[in-house]
Regions:
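A short acidic, Gly/Pro-enriched loop at the edge of an enzyme's catalytic core
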Residues: 153-163
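A short glycine-rich, Lys/Arg-flanked "PGG" loop and its adjoining helix->strand segment in the class I
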Residues: 178-190
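Class I (Rossmann-like) S-adenosyl-L-methionine-dependent methyltransferase catalytic domain
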Residues: 8, 20-100, 106-155, 174, ...
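A short SAM/SAH-binding and catalytic strip from SAM-dependent methyltransferases
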Residues: 162-175
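N-terminal accessory segments
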Residues: 1-20
Length: 296
């Protein structure tokens, strides 16, 4: 409340500059490094996690929306993503991992760990946000690629042995989710594996029983959960004016979705994919994790 009151006192022309300054201070490397070092003292980390965390980059872009000042949560998400991939690969590994796709890469929350976990792979970092993939190219050596709202027209120009798609299905409507799955089918190399995350029963319970809204108005969130309970899928656009559509010129098709495993499997089959892995709440104890390969 105090922050909102103070914001009204600041001239409108100054607000973007002051906001950028605040974000730069919050993401200052010295601050982030201290947060990482605190996490390194966690006795529950495995030796492998500690080794990755000890070497991972501290550089967080000030526009990284995944970092809101909590370095521990930020780095834990990356460590959990590596664990997800390791579990999938223990079940179904490509012949070799030479080409790796991170879509959406954002500003590298997971990618900074992937480049350490798979040092022999060539990475493609793809995102719709201007500057995000370029940051990943500069900091982590990835090939940058710009995404688009209409995924049916996206051609990345190569096939991939392993693809990670963290928390994108969580924001797409049914049609866009199917197009994303078809994109995987087009871009997977023989034996390649696509791994993605989605909101399922856990998030539905949080909305229905705990009043969580996931940045939707309460009635929209309730409608999403109700549709999910009836059909296995629920979706609603984010409301306007929250900044979510800055990179989506159509002004729609980006919000909150709930997808049951059965619904995902039907869509994947329609896209020509076969499931090889599923774990409820596998990523950060929050999002469900799926892995698919192209049907033979």
């Amino acid at each position: 409340m105090l922050r909102q009151q103070l914001r009204k006192l600041v001239p409108a022309a100054w607000r973007p500059h002051l906001g950028a300054l605040r974000r730069r201070l919050v993401a200052h490397p010295l601050r982030v490094r201290a947060q990482r070092r605190r996490l390194l003292r966690d006795p529950d980390l495995t030796a492998r996690q500690r080794e990755l965390l000890d070497r991972v980059s501290d550089r967080i872009h000030h526009r990284d929306g995944m970092y809101a000042g909590d370095g521990e949560s930020y780095f834990r998400a990356g460590l959990s993503a590596v664990e997800c991939l390791d579990e999938v690969l223990a079940r179904r590994a490509p012949p070799e991992i030479r080409r790796f796709l991170d879509l959406p890469c954002g500003y590298g929350r997971e990618l900074r760990f992937f480049v350490l976990r798979f040092p022999g792979a060539a990475f493609t970092a793809c995102d719709i946000q201007p500057g995000a993939a370029d940051f990943c190219a500069r900091e982590f050596g990835a090939r940058p690629a710009r995404s688009r709202p209409a995924l049916a027209g996206l051609d990345l120009g190569e096939e991939f042995d392993l693809a990670w798609c963290g928390s994108l299905v969580t924001h797409l409507d049914a049609d866009a989710t199917l197009e994303l799955l078809r994109l995987f089918a087009r871009h997977l190399a023989p034996g390649g594996v696509a791994v993605f995350t989605a909101y399922g029963d856990h998030v539905a319970r949080r909305i229905s029983e705990e009043g969580a809204t996931y940045d939707l108005p309460a009635d929209y969130a309730a409608a999403v959960a109700d549709s999910y309970a009836r059909t296995g899928h629920g979706y609603h656009d984010y409301p306007r004016g929250q900044g979510y559509f800055d990179f989506h010129p159509e002004g729609r098709g980006y919000g909150v979705s709930l997808t049951s495993p059965a619904w995902v499997r039907r869509q994947a089959a329609a896209a020509g994919l076969a499931e090889v892995y599923f774990r409820e709440r596998g990523w950060s104890n929050h999002e469900d994790v799926f892995a698919f390969v192209k049907r033979a």
